[in-house]
Swiss-Prot record:
Ca(2+) 2 binds at residues 100, 103, 105, 107. Heterodimer; disulfide-linked. GO terms for biological process: proteolysis. SUPFAM superfamilies: Metalloproteases ('zincins'), catalytic domain (SSF55486). This is Zinc metalloproteinase-disintegrin-like ammodytagin. Pfam families: Reprolysin. Zn(2+) binds at residues 64, 68, 74. One of its GO terms (molecular function) is metalloendopeptidase activity. Expressed by the venom gland. Its main location: secreted. The active site is at residue 65.
Length: 184
């Protein structure tokens, strides 16, 4: 058994009769690419590596593992996103939620940014340009995360593809600041 599987077993034994669900955050490296592991049937426990500077990335892994604890599996090629798929966008009539914008979904095009409000994710002030070394490919979670380094700079968190990084330039999939006409 791997160190992650042994730790998960021991944690599951500890909490077996004490809680409905438990998630253990650890600073220990979980076997290279493993950022989290959870049982889908045995005991409702998860083990999550606190691996990043951003609590949002760690929270995302924890939510993923909690989904496994609740019996959810990964979507596969056969899933065409009916209601049972995790990637399915819920209809406004199917959920209870606060007020939303537009057609109820955030659908920003590459390079789009919002300023604030309930439709904003990773909010930035309008017209803000990030430093070229902050380009970050959201699809590369778990690799070298780039964040602002100076305490004088605002914290932009992750900077996704298409974010303006200089005049006429945007972040591309190689985390480089390139001419907007050659980025895609």
């Amino acid at each position: 058994k791997s160190a992650a599987x042994v730790t998960l077993d021991l944690f599951g034994d500890w909490r077996a009769k004490r809680h409905d669900n438990a998630q253990l955050l650890t600073g220990i490296n979980l076997n290279g690419q493993t950022l989290g592991i959870a049982f889908m049937s045995k005991x409702s426990v998860g083990l999550i590596q606190d691996y990043x500077k951003s609590y949002l990335l760690v929270a995302s892994v924890m939510a993923h593992e909690l989904g496994h604890n609740l019996g959810m599996e990964h979507d596969d090629g056969n899933c065409i996103c009916p209601a049972k798929c995790i990637d399915n966008k819920p209809l406004r009539t199917d959920i209870v939620s606060p007020a939303v914008c537009g057609n109820y979904f955030v659908e920003l095009t590459p390079g789009s940014q919002c300023a604030d409000g309930v439709c904003c994710d990773q909010c930035r002030k309008a017209g803000v340009t990030v430093a070229p070394d902050l380009c970050f490919d959201y699809n590369q979670l778990g690799t070298e995360d780039k964040f602002t380094h100076s305490p004088d700079d605002p914290d932009y968190g992750m900077v996704d593809l298409g974010t303006k990084c200089a005049d006429g330039k945007v972040c591309n999939s190689n985390r480089q600041c390139v001419d907007v006409n050659t980025a895609y």
